């Protein structure tokens, strides 16, 4: 049927071309020049006069990349045939000329059929994407109903330390529902003493299943920013990149925070990226374990040799059970589960790239983990203190001086970053740097040692390693996943797949086996599969109160659906499977 339609369309185009360019009787105003009533060589109908400033109307959606070059080539061929035909046209159009134009029209008919198919596929993808984009924007905020609360340290009951890093300490915390609970805790001196406080329901009873400390408060160590709120916000502004709009509505001492055009970007919410619910400056308290764990970071009035200032920045986030490193020390996920965990990191990195942000400090310590009702881990990227989120430069950082910071994690620094040399016009491209780090972390997720950590002969350095030195992954790992991890760790960034294409590869390998099994992968078959996946995902999301990890991943896939990126992922998978 498609061939018949293309032939019919080709005949119509061929007939139209013959009628358009065939010689017409009438006055001639010069050798080889048509009269005023003719319109040879202008692509117009005879007798139609166009205004000098008229512009051709665009024909709907732009032609996909894979057809554009061929269409332009055909257009050039048409121009040559037209010129030759006009020269010979005075003697009449012979059978040969008619055959050439008929063949040319048939070729255009086939191209137009492919173009129409691509337009239908692109339109279907856009409609599916619009549905699931709205659903993925619904990131829960436990403080959403407390519009003007939580902007002071005194609003929280702080428990024990969760952990500490290079620039901050993190504590568990809760906010009593009723004001009298807070007043009672303050009266008893429980603030900062690790009280045994649980969340309460609206009636004052403990909410079933509610954690005792649902929040984590990150207290930044302030050594060089001074004690003014302006200086603190300027120095630590990168920490505010994943903050919600409501998080920045509080008063920072005597200062109300305002985002400047030259400041860092504000990251849109994503299920695989941490969300900061509240941010504020306050005096540094003496929290549990401070004198033992980080005495040098305290102000001198707590520790005489302390280097810290008396005021700093506090960030309120969700309290996650553990980090990825802690989870992998206790658990060994199955190959399918590990593939889904790697996929979650790629989804998060793709969102950062689309927002023009580079994390630059991806490691298993900066990835948090929680579980769904089935015990499947859900990963969240955290700690944006080293991120690149500059509106002026995007992901292309000018590297005109060696004093420009490359990022925070030297071991997992992509080759194009670690080997960059400063100069007047030097630029570091971070568009695929975090994707490379995901490839390295994938070794840990699949139960192997990270090849870029440690010492000895097995240790690799991103500056000098060769791809042949990368250790083989276990045979239990699916072949396409092994191939993808190696492709993510290619030294040349332009040879690596983007985070979006890499995520699509894993999506297809997990849930698109039926589609990949087809001998001839056509767009109409792909669209039918996507519609089926959309219906099944919507149904699964409705049937469960809380979506499981697989459903959430499928929703992310459909929310980021792009026809071209999906086709590239399918072709990449097919080429890997066809290779010996």
UniProtKB/Swiss-Prot annotation:
SUPFAM superfamilies: Protein kinase-like (PK-like)
Membrane topology category: Single-pass membrane protein
Residues of the active site: 361 (proton acceptor)
Tagged with keyword Hydrolase: no
CC cofactor: Mg(2+)
Origin superkingdom: Eukaryota
PTM entry text: Proteolytically cleaved. In healthy cells, the precursor is continuously imported into the inner mitochondrial membrane (IMM), where it is proteolytically cleaved by mitochondrial-processing peptidase (MPP) and then undergoes further proteolytic cleavage by PARL or AFG3L2 to give rise to the 52 kDa short form. The 52 kDa short form is then released into the cytosol where it rapidly undergoes proteasome-dependent degradation. Autophosphorylated. Loss of mitochondrial membrane potential results in the precursor accumulating on the outer mitochondrial membrane (OMM) where it is activated by autophosphorylation. Autophosphorylation at Ser-227 and Ser-401 is sufficient and essential for selective recruitment of PRKN to depolarized mitochondria, via PINK1-dependent phosphorylation of ubiquitin and maybe PRKN.
Annotated positions of the Phosphoserine modification: 227, 401
Annotated GO CC locations: astrocyte projection; axon; cell body; chromatin; cytoplasm; cytoskeleton; cytosol; endoplasmic reticulum
Top-level EC class as recorded in UniProt: transferase
One of the protein's GO biological processes: positive regulation of macroautophagy
Reactions catalysed according to its record: L-seryl-[protein] + ATP = O-phospho-L-seryl-[protein] + ADP + H(+); L-threonyl-[protein] + ATP = O-phospho-L-threonyl-[protein] + ADP + H(+)
Disulfide bonds: none
Physiological role: Serine/threonine-protein kinase which acts as a sensor of mitochondrial damage and protects against mitochondrial dysfunction during cellular stress. It phosphorylates mitochondrial proteins to coordinate mitochondrial quality control mechanisms that remove and replace dysfunctional mitochondrial components. Depending on the severity of mitochondrial damage, activity ranges from preventing apoptosis and stimulating mitochondrial biogenesis to eliminating severely damaged mitochondria via PINK1-PRKN-dependent mitophagy.
Subunit structure: Upon mitochondrial depolarization, it forms a supercomplex with TOM and TIM23 complexes. PINK1-TOM-TIM23 supercomplex formation requires PINK1 interaction with TOMM20 and TOMM70 and is critical for PINK1 stabilization at the outer mitochondrial membrane, kinase activation and downstream mitophagy. Upon mitochondrial depolarization, interacts with TIMM23; the interaction is required for PINK1 accumulation at the outer mitochondrial membrane, kinase activation by autophosphorylation and PRKN recruitement to mitochondria. Interacts with PRKN. Interacts with FBXO7.
Record-given protein name: Serine/threonine-protein kinase PINK1, mitochondrial
Organism name: Rattus norvegicus
């Amino acid at each position: 049927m498609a061939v018949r339609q293309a032939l019919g369309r080709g005949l119509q185009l061929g007939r139209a071309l013959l009628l358009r360019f065939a010689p017409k009787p009438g006055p001639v105003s010069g050798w080889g020049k048509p009269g005023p009533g003719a319109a040879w060589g202008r692509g117009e109908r005879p007798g139609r006069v166009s205004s000098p400033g008229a512009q051709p109307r665009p024909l709907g959606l732009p032609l996909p990349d894979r057809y554009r070059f061929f269409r332009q080539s055909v257009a050039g061929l048409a121009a040559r045939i037209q010129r030759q035909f006009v020269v010979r046209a005075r003697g009449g159009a012979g059978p040969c000329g008619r055959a050439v134009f008929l063949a040319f029209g048939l070729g255009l008919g086939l191209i137009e059929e492919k173009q129409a198919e691509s337009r239908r596929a692109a339109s279907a993808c856009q409609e599916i994407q619009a549905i699931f984009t709205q659903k993925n924007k619904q990131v829960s905020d436990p403080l959403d109903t407390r519009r003007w609360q939580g902007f002071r340290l005194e609003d929280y009951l702080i428990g024990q330390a969760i952990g500490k890093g290079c620039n901050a300490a993190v504590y568990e915390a809760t906010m009593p529902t009723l004001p009298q609970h807070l007043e009672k805790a303050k009266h008893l001196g429980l603030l900062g003493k690790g009280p045994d406080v649980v969340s309460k329901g609206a009636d004052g009873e403990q909410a079933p299943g509610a954690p005792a400390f649902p929040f984590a408060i990150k207290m930044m160590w302030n050594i060089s920013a001074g004690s003014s709120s302006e200086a603190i916000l300027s120095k630590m502004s990168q920490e505010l990149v994943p903050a919600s709009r409501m998080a920045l509505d509080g008063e920072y001492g005597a200062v109300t925070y305002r985002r400047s055009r030259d400041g860092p970007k504000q990251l849109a919410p994503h299920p695989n990226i941490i969300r900061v619910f509240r941010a504020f400056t306050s005096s540094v308290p003496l929290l549990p374990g401070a004198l033992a764990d980080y005495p040098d970071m305290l102000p001198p009035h707590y520790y005489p040799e302390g280097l810290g200032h008396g005021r700093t920045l506090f960030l309120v986030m969700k309290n996650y059970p553990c980090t990825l490193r802690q989870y992998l020390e206790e658990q060994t996920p199955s190959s399918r589960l590990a593939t889904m965990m790697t996929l979650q990191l790629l989804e998060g990195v793709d969102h950062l790239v689309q927002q023009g942000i580079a994390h630059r400090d991806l490691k298993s310590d900066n990835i948090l983990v929680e579980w769904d009702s089935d015990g499947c881990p859900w990963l969240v990227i955290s700690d944006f203190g080293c991120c690149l989120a500059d509106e002026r430069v995007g992901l292309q950082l000018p590297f005109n001086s060696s004093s420009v910071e490359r990022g925070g994690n030297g071991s997992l620094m992509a080759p194009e970053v670690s080997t960059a040399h400063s100069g007047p016009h030097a630029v570091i491209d971070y568009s695929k740097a975090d994707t490379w780090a995901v490839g390295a972390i994938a070794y840990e997720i699949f139960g192997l040692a990270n090849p870029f950590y440690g010492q000895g002969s097995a240790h690799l350095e991103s500056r000098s390693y060769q791809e042949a030195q990368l250790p083989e992954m276990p045979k239990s790992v699916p072949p396409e996943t092994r191939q993808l991890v190696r492709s993510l760790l290619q030294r040349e960034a332009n040879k690596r797949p983007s985070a979006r294409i890499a995520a699509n590869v894993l999506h297809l390998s997990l849930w698109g086996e039926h589609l990949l099994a087809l001998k001839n992968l056509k767009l109409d078959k792909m669209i039918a599969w996507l519609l089926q996946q959309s219906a099944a995902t919507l149904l699964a999301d409705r049937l469960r109160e809380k979506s499981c990890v697989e459903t959430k991943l499928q929703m992310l896939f459909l929310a980021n659906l792009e026809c071209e990126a999906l086709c590239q992922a399918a072709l990449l998978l097919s080429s890997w499977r066809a290779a010996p």
